[in-house]
Structures are given as structure tokens and as C-alpha cells.
């Protein structure tokens, strides 16, 4: 059975790999010249199931208003006039209740924990190396109010059986020695010892190499134009003016997925959250982080690779704008100077931005659609790296009609009450603009 995977980020590549392991004939198509060239290229590098939480949370609407007035705020909104932007924000606001937050977080943690287990198994089986570390994540609190507010997240961690450790200032210096000199600006921390780190682009590149050995074909530099369909089946995909056919189709196009799906009558509430990162060469290993640090105040992650520090964060709701905002670089540099002033050379840092495909409830869209041979793997937001292996393996099991190792409840697009709004006769979805 032939499967055509659209998109070669970490999600599409993981989908292809796990499909090939189940014996499918897999072809991956992407407009870029190699895998992991867009959202997966320079993300924060953290694999943090315990911190899998939706942005839509109680109190966020009021925080968002406050953040809009701050220079170094973690969230910014630039209204584009796009109706989809307004609808997405309205849906997000509806998910900012305690009950919805609990449901959404459970789904995210369920998939994230499974994904971490899949990654551990993959690493044990193959020895894949991607500058990975398994030394946990430490969430830094600069105020006592932040420490107190963490009680709600700790309750969810306990319910999910996720190990954690509350740290005072001395405890912070114990797990992250380079912070000893600045511990007085901190009020405490929450550490998740089972979290991991690694270079997502490097991982995706090596996973693609392993997929090639399993027979997966990668076709780069090709324009995915539109889906051709009739009734409840996809007939093929128009790629560079030619109709490509397969038995099953997987859409893993990140923020661009809705543009392909809308003409089919599928409303996928996935919207780009623009994020930024700095990659800083390490000049003093003893003054650099040991693993991943999360700065709760600025919602920024600082991750240690072999000889580099990756600093990533922020969310701009600004459509598909990929311009680099110098103010965001200023914020990232400020945080590095706050916490690791002697760790790396900021003058040699590379500045990057990418579009995270986010759903309004935080949970990705993984699973079947109203079309019998079309499957989705998109909408992972800031957790694409954390959820990649689990999402790919889960989807491969669903396509193979095998019982997944975790419940897939609440993960597919049916949770949004989607119904097709197209005619029954054959149509083609028009080309999506990228």
C-alpha cells in the first residue's frame, strides 16, 4: 500500500519513518531542499512532556492584555484583517476555562509522554544521536506568586504520575551550577527530571536517513498545489502540475495545512504562532546551562546542545509574516545576559524565526478525516519536537488499522465538530499559497 506524506518537517518525517516500519511504501514531498527546513529548523530543542500545556488557560485573557503593553512580553498580537485569525483567537478564548484547560492538558500530556517513550525506544534500538541529553527541565520562577501558581500544574503532574521536584535557590544551583551567581534574582523552580533536550533538525535529518534505508522516497523542491477528490476519497495530489496518486495521504504541512483542507470542506483551526530563537556558541562550558531552563516570566527556553546554547520563545499572532523583529532578539539577549552572562558569545549568535502550527485548544490534530484515505498530523504548536515520534507512530497504527498503544480519544479533527461542506461530485482544491 502506497502512502504519500505531504511535508518533511519532524512530524512528516516521523510519520514516514513509522509507516515504513509497518511495511508501507512511502513517498515524502516538500517544497524545501531538505527535511526540517521550516518550523523544525531551529526550535528551542526541548522535549518536555511534563510542561505540555495549552496556551489557552484560565487567566490568560487578562495576562494577554497586560503583555500587550510590555516591551519584552511573551505574547504579541498583530491584527491582519484575516477572518481566520479572529475566529482562531475567539476559539482560544473559549478554551480559557478551568474545565477545558484540564481536558486539553490531559490530551497533550498523554501524547507527549507516549512520544517521549517512543523516542527512548528509537534511541535504544538505533543509537541515533542528535546532541541529546536526558537531564531534565528546570522552570525558573522569579517571583513567589509564580511559585504559588505552579500548584495547579503540580496537581496535574501528580495526577498523571509525572515525577517532579520543587527547588529553592540552593537547589537551583545544584542542578544548574552556572545559575549559582544569579540565584538571588530567583524565587524557586520546578524541575522535571525525565525531560530531555536535543537538536530537532539534526534528529530529523538522521531519521530521514534511516527512513531512506527502509525504502522511503524523499522528493524535495516540489510545489504541492492542490488535492483532487471525489465523494469521500482523495483521488490524488497535484504536484508541479502532475497528479500524484496513492492509497493513503498524510497531510503534515504545519501552518499551511488549513489552506489545503479548506476547499475540501474541512475546517482545521490551525494558525501560525510566530516564534524566535537565538543559537549562541558556548565560550565557557561551566557558565552555560546543563540542560533546559524555562524562564516563566518571559516564556523563554534556554537549551544546551554540545557546543551551543539555543534560546527560544515568544509567540506572535501575526499571520504568515516571517520577518525578523529586532525587538525579539533584544529580549532573548536580555534573558541570556540575566541568567548566563558568561556562557556564550552573543555577537556570534544566529537569529531565526519560524511559524508554529497551533490549535486553539493546544492539542494537535492527529488521525482520520471525513475522507476515507486522508489523514492529518498537524497543529502541534510549540510541542512538535516533543510530540513527533508519538504522533508519527500513532498515525501509522491508525492507518494500518492496528490498536494504538495509547488512546486516540480527542486527538482527531472530529473534536471540532467538523462536517464537510462540499458538493458530492469530484472537485479539486485550488493551489495553496505559501
Swiss-Prot record:
Q: Which NCBIfam families match?
A: PRK00711.1
Q: Which gene encodes it?
A: dadA2
Q: Keyword annotations for this protein?
A: FAD, Flavoprotein, Oxidoreductase
The protein's name: D-amino acid dehydrogenase 2
One biological-process term from Gene Ontology? Answer: D-alanine catabolic process
Record function comment: Oxidative deamination of D-amino acids.
Residues recorded as binding FAD, renumbered to this chain, are 3-17
Q: Which cofactor does it need?
A: FAD
From what organism does this protein derive?
Pseudomonas putida (strain ATCC 47054 / DSM 6125 / CFBP 8728 / NCIMB 11950 / KT2440)
The entry assigns this protein to a family as follows: Belongs to the DadA oxidoreductase family.
Q: Which GO terms describe its molecular function?
A: D-amino-acid dehydrogenase activity
Amino acid at each position: 500500500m502506497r502512502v504519500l506524506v505531504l511535508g518533511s518537517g519532524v512530524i512528516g518525517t516521523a510519520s514516514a519513518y513509522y509507516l515504513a516500519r509497518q511495511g508501507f511504501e512511502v513517498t515524502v514531498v516538500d517544497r524545501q531542499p531538505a527535511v526540517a527546513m521550516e518550523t523544525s529548523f531551529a526550535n528551542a530543542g526541548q522535549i518536555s512532556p511534563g510542561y505540555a500545556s495549552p496556551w489557552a488557560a484560565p487567566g490568560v485573557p487578562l495576562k494577554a492584555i497586560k503583555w500587550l503593553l510590555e516591551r519584552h512580553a511573551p505574547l504579541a498580537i498583530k491584527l491582519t484583517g484575516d477572518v481566520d485569525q479572529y475566529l482562531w483567537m475567539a476559539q482560544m478564548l473559549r478554551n480559557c476555562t478551568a474545565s477545558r484547560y484540564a481536558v486539553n492538558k490531559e490530551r497533550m500530556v498523554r501524547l507527549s509522554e507516549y512520544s517521549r517513550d517512543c523516542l527512548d525506544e528509537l534511541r535504544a534500538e538505533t543509537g541515533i544521536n542528535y546532541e541529546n541529553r536526558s537531564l531534565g527541565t528546570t522552570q525558573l520562577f522569579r517571583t513567589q506568586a509564580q511559585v504559588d501558581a505552579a500548584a495547579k500544574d503540580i496537581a496535574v503532574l501528580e495526577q498523571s504520575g509525572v515525577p517532579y521536584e520543587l527547588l529553592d535557590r540552593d537547589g537551583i544551583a545544584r542542578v544548574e551550577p552556572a545559575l549559582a551567581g544569579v540565584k538571588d534574582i530567583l524565587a524557586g523552580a520546578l524541575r522535571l527530571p525525565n525531560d530531555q533536550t536535543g537538536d530537532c533538525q539534526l534528529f530529523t535529518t538522521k531519521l530521514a536517513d534511516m527512513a531512506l534505508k527502509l525504502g522511503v522516497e524523499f522528493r524535495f523542491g516540489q510545489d504541492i498545489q492542490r488535492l483532487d477528490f471525489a465523494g469521500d476519497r482523495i483521488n490524488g495530489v497535484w504536484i508541479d502540475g502532475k497528479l500524484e496518486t496513492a492509497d493513503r495521504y498524510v497531510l503534515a504541512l504545519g501552518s499551511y495545512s488549513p489552506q489545503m483542507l479548506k476547499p475540501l470542506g474541512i475546517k482545521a483551526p490551525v494558525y501560525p504562532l510566530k516564534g524566535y530563537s537565538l543559537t549562541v556558541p558556548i565560550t565557557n562550558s561551566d557558565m552555560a546551562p546543563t540542560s533546559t531552563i524555562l524562564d516563566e516570566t518571559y516564556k523563554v527556553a534556554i537549551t544546551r546542545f554540545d557546543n551551543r546554547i539555543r534560546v527560544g520563545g515568544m509567540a506572535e499572532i501575526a499571520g504568515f509574516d516571517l520577518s525578523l523583529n529586532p525587538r525579539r532578539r533584544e529580549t532573548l539577549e536580555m534573558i541570556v545576559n540575566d541568567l548566563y552572562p558568561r556562557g556564550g558569545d552573543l555577537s556570534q549568535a544566529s537569529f531565526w524565526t519560524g511559524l508554529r502550527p497551533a490549535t486553539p485548544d493546544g492539542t494537535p490534530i492527529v488521525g482520520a478525516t471525513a475522507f476515507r484515505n486522508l489523514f492529518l498530523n498537524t497543529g502541534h504548536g510549540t510541542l512538535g519536537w516533543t510530540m513527533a515520534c508519538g504522533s508519527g507512530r500513532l498515525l501509522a497504527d491508525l492507518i494500518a488499522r492496528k490498536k494504538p498503544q495509547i488512546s486516540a480519544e480527542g486527538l482527531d479533527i472530529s473534536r471540532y465538530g467538523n462536517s464537510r461542506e462540499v458538493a458530492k461530485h469530484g472537485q479539486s482544491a485550488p493551489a495553496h499559497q505559501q
